[in-house]
Amino acid sequence: MSDAQQITLLVDGEETKVTTGTTGAELFFERRDVVVARVNGELKDLDQELPEGAEVEGVTIESPDGLNVLRHSTAHVMAQAVQQLRPDAKLGIGPYITDGFYFDFDVAEPFTPEDLKTLEKMMQKIINQNQKFVRRVVSEDEAREAMKNEPYKLELLGKKNEAAEAGEGVNVEVGAGDITIYDNVERKEGTTVWCDLCRGPHLPNTKLISNAFALTRSSSAYWLGNQKNQQLQRIYGTAWPTKDALKAYQERIAEAERRDHRKLGSELDLFSFPDELGSGLPVFHPKGGIIRKEMEDYSRQRHVEAGYEFVYTPHITKGHLYEVSGHLDWYKEGMFPAMHVDAELNEDGTVRKPGQDYYLKPMNCPMHNLIFRSRGRSYRELPLRLFEFGSVYRYEKSGVVHGLTRVRGMTQDDAHIYCTREQMKEELTKTLTFVLDLLKDYGLNDFYLELSTKDPEKYVGEDAAWEEATRTLAEVAQESGLELVPDPGGAAFYGPKISVQAKDALGRTWQMSTIQLDFNLPERFELEFQAADGSRQRPVMIHRALFGSVERFMGVLTEHYAGAFPAWLAPVQVVGIPVAETFNEYMFDVVDQLKAAGIRAEVDTSSDRFPKKIRTASKDKIPFVLIAGGDDAEAGAVSFRFRDGSQDNGVPVAEAVKRITEAVRNRTS
């Protein structure tokens, strides 16, 4: 073989010579787990020829990118099945998403659960046919001819040059580079049985999907995510490399449903969402109020120890405040509409005194700036750390409101720190350490950090200030030793931020605390302090919310603990259950001793039989159940029954009180 017939590739880090025209499938022929190739950093179908000098890496089906391709290909199979079941269905967009995929369809009737079962069977037939996914590069005219009966695809072709901004999922179908169509080709006859406008890549064939997939639900969705557009029907699904992986995922989903804080909030009588109040406006019941109070009280204690000063600000303000801050320019869509008040009219209807617009506050920072500006400040006062459990109101679309984790009225544990530029990095480091330590005290221990940087279309201030702020935040994050993940364009309009991402007991990631560095609002509010040399200087401002919001954090903790809160947070920490009514008085005496020690304890004196009382305490997820019968009363003891069903019998009352109070004080149970 002559050199002219060969090309050199860098394959998985090693230089390799292959024949000109070699495809990824040929290169990785012996590696059956490879489903696509990464060529010079881009994912490519295995049947594409590899260019001279390319860096090539085999991507396995179990890798993150391989899973995405698997799920995207499964979405195509589902769409093929839908158009077999309903030939008049028009195709929308069908991308992969976290743990699965979806596809949108314009259909006359919504899909039913029975439809999804039928579609799964049809999909399995398609998969078993081992159809090939074949990429075809076409001109725009050819694409329009192929998609002439698909109006939504034709619309996408018109958005090719604006795919990144055109709407939800558009860049899955069209974008920079060639226009491509993927054909599903029947193997025996070699005929195309279905096709879709798509950028790919895809699996080599449907057989690789196997039977490890499921359609999970259907819902409505607006075309391109825009409420002004046609409402379509969306089918969600999931796909995994093996049946065992699918089963494990389904078990995680089932456990997540059991832990759903909305369900547990109702079952445990913690909170509710009355229709009379409106969407996203929860109320906390007495038991939920106890948990919330304990969360807030401990946070207050830790903030005092860390040198924060407490402030309070009103719920509404004149609109001018948010003109100064920039919120009305950059955040108005997230605010409730203005209330126009204080106008005075003459008898003839003419205006004697113009009114003013007032707004429910979406953020506390402008008001904290007014506190800083209320008098002269010296460098000796800095860093000044202001803290507030501040109620804020944000207009979330009704479709995204979700229990406690996405509300319209919330309480932020909001701090704003004012410091000199010289203090900036040390203060950021202290703040991050404080945040992580406090989250650990609430039972979250698995973290990584995300660095959100400037959105070039939506920011205020000088580029140099943004660059300095971003660089400093990155240094602090890297020095923490935690993984740092970039979030390009994710910052608020006034400054970059670090967000702490925490994993719960199910391994799900939640955004918790945010730490934001801001040179811009001090400029807009003309904040100043007198420096050591007598000059007037601008402070640096650090925004920090630890819980994010109290409501959201409580929702996360409810699911993290599956409602079985540690004893220090539990609404009822101890339930005493006498084995018979004869021992009620003895148990009341034990509970009185616990109450005197600050423990939330009660006696179950209901008419239920003893086994039912035990089941009730278990259902209510009580941390400590104390049982007393004749032997216990005679010995001055009680028996412990724990959440896992284990018992510790004959514990002296004084020892029982000590154990419980220590567990609560040390937050160990």
From Swiss-Prot:
It catalyses: tRNA(Thr) + L-threonine + ATP = L-threonyl-tRNA(Thr) + AMP + diphosphate + H(+). Its cofactor is Zn(2+). Its EC number is 6.1.1.3. CDD domains: TGS_ThrRS (cd01667), ThrRS_anticodon (cd00860), ThrRS_core (cd00771). It holds the Pfam family tRNA_SAD. Residues 260-566 are annotated as: Catalytic. Binds 1 zinc ion per subunit. Residues 3-60 form the TGS domain. Transmembrane segments: none annotated. GO terms for cellular component: cytoplasm. Zn(2+) binds at C365, H416, H543. It is found in: Cytoplasm. GO terms for biological process: threonyl-tRNA aminoacylation. Homodimer. This is Threonine--tRNA ligase. It comes from Pseudarthrobacter chlorophenolicus (strain ATCC 700700 / DSM 12829 / CIP 107037 / JCM 12360 / KCTC 9906 / NCIMB 13794 / A6) (Arthrobacter chlorophenolicus).
